[in-house]
Amino acid sequence: MNSNVENLPPHIIRLVYKEVTTLTADPPDGIKVFPNEEDLTDLQVTIEGPEGTPYAGGLFRMKLLLGKDFPASPPKGYFLTKIFHPNVGPNGEICVNVLKRDWTAELGIRHVLLTIKCLLIHPNPESALNEEAGRLLLENYEEYAARARLLTEIHGGACSTSSGRAEASRDLASGASASSTDPMTPGVLGGAEGPMAKKHAGERDKKLAAKKKLDKKRALRRL
């Protein structure tokens, strides 16, 4: 995606830079911002799943994209980590009023991030982008919560501990481009360090040992 920095007036760039710098140094609780030094209009963010919700224990990557008309027009928000939530579409698009009709130029990036975090606590099924999640939230909360927890464990599970959250934050800060659905992401069920990978590694070691034993027997027969 092309940068919109060159399309923003200098005074808007200064305002964005000032707020992003403040957010990086003093972020809201459970939120971290990783500015793109080459493109201030593309903000990478992590949000910890709030306690008492099906998203607790997960760390969710998202991004905010500032358009060329910002702040007259709201930024666009996307979850990069797969999540089961009524207000998050298949492509990760976030539907929340502050990013649509309730937006005003006076609202800042901090307000947007706090609103998105609140959306994890209080989903709005009436403006659902994921209709199945919205229906379950209204008709069968236990099933909705189970589905949301499952995806949190699979895709945000690498960050269910403080050390995992720190590792994920370091990866994001260093410009890691792999999403949490990448099959090589540590902690995911099929990841490079996950249980399935360890199982395959054990089977490979057994086959290698058996081959060495067979080769040794063949060598002894030749003597």
Swiss-Prot record:
Phosphoserine: residues bearing it: S174
Active site residues per record: C95
Biased composition (Basic residues): 209-223
EC identifiers of the protein: 2.3.2.23
Enzyme class: transferase
The entry's keywords: Acetylation, ATP-binding, Cell cycle, Cell division, Nucleotide-binding, Phosphoprotein, Transferase, Ubl conjugation, Ubl conjugation pathway
Annotated metabolic or biological route of this protein: Protein modification; protein ubiquitination
Signal peptide: none
Protein name as catalogued: Ubiquitin-conjugating enzyme E2 S
Species in which this protein is naturally found: Rattus norvegicus (Rat)
